[in-house]
């Protein structure tokens, strides 16, 4: 039977103290396992304590190593981030700087509504008055529909400011809407002048606008205030004169058949009778003028139909042999 050098601990009969030798937990290759058993008690205890210290030192070393590794890793990460930041800064330096800037003028004008655009143009004229004539030249002329719509809006503004709990025709009502009334009448005057000859050469356009503007004026509330009555009467008289100016613009032309054609096409005689009745005969001269033109035209047409063989113009009625009045014939007489 093979024997080993390892011996189990025994109890000495002469010594009552027990010596317990613990098996070392460390497996140090430099210390044989059997030599530990044969060591004396003090030496073994010292060795065991030393082993424990070594184990603790090994643990501290591993912790230190881990901490060092973590520190190194953190340092490496920090260096990587710094290098990344440095590279990103380098890239930003190459990228052109983008900063905010105002809208271009065409985009700015596109974004403005009617009210703000009007304020912009008026402010521009206030700063640079010399631009007024240029703006008038380059701006397009408003259409009849747009012109009438603007006057209608100003008329509606008057109606909307009338008091609810008061007589509409009272002085209080008139004083309340007076600023809006003045603005309305001023606009009517400006637009009428815009549709008069020689600026407006189309008689039909001028008369169409005058008809709509006349209706708006006499549809105003009939305030009892004397100032309003005088203002309204004067305005209607001036509008009636403008009708005469438009109708007589081609009076110098031979025949002047355009006005008769327009009177028939627009049914002006019926409309003027209505205006004259509502305005208390303010349009009587205009009605008489239209009647006179229609009568003259009818007389000419009747004469042409009666004498179909007669020339239609005065120059054709007169035929003169000018050879009798030559210088040679005169001297021979």
From Swiss-Prot:
Assembly and binders: Binds the proteasome.
Keywords: Cytoplasm, Nucleus, Protein transport, Transport
InterPro entries referenced in this protein's UniProt entry, alphabetically: Cut8/Sts1_fam (IPR013868), Cut8/Sts1_sf (IPR038422)
Cysteine disulfide partners in this protein: none
One cellular-component annotation, GO: cytoplasm
Main location: cytoplasm
Compositionally biased tracts (Low complexity): 62-76
Protein encoded by which gene: STS1
This protein's name: Tethering factor for nuclear proteasome STS1
GO MF terms, alphabetically ordered: proteasome binding
Example of a GO biological process term: protein transport
Pfam families, alphabetized: Cut8
Compositional bias annotation for Polar residues: 1-13
């Amino acid at each position: 039977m093979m024997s080993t050098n390892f011996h189990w601990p025994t109890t000495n009969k002469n010594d009552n103290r027990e010596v317990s030798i613990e098996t070392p937990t460390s497996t140090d290759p430099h210390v044989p396992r059997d030599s530990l058993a044969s060591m004396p008690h003090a030496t073994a205890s010292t060795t065991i304590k030393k082993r424990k210290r070594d184990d603790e030192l090994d643990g501290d070393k591993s912790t230190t190593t881990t901490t060092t590794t973590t520190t190194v890793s953190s340092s490496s990460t920090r260096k990587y981030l710094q290098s990344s930041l440095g590279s990103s800064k380098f890239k930003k330096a190459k990228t052109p700087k983008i900063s905010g800037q105002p809208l271009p003028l065409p985009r700015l004008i596109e974004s403005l509504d009617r009210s703000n655009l009007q304020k912009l143009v008026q402010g521009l004229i206030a700063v640079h008055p010399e631009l007024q004539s240029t703006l008038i030249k380059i701006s397009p002329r408003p259409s009849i529909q747009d012109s009438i719509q603007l006057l209608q809006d100003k008329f509606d503004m008057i109606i909307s400011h009338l008091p609810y709990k008061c007589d509409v025709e009272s002085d209080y009502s008139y004083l309340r809407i007076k600023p809006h009334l003045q603005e309305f009448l001023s606009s009517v005057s400006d637009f009428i002048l815009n549709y008069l000859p020689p600026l407006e050469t189309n008689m039909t356009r001028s008369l169409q606008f005058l008809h709509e503007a006349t209706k708006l004026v006499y549809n105003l509330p009939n305030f009892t205030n004397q100032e309003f009555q005088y203002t309204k009467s004067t305005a209607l008289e001036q509008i009636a004169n403008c009708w005469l100016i438009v109708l007589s613009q081609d009076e110098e032309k031979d025949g002047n058949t355009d006005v008769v054609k327009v009177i028939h096409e627009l049914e002006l005689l019926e409309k003027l009778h209505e205006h004259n009745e509502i305005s208390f005969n303010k349009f009587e001269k205009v009605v008489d003028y239209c009647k006179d033109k229609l009568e003259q035209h009818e007389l000419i047409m009747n004469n042409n139909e009666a004498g179909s063989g007669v020339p239609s113009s005065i120059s054709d009625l007169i035929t003169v042999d000018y050879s009798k009045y030559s210088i040679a014939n005169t001297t021979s007489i």
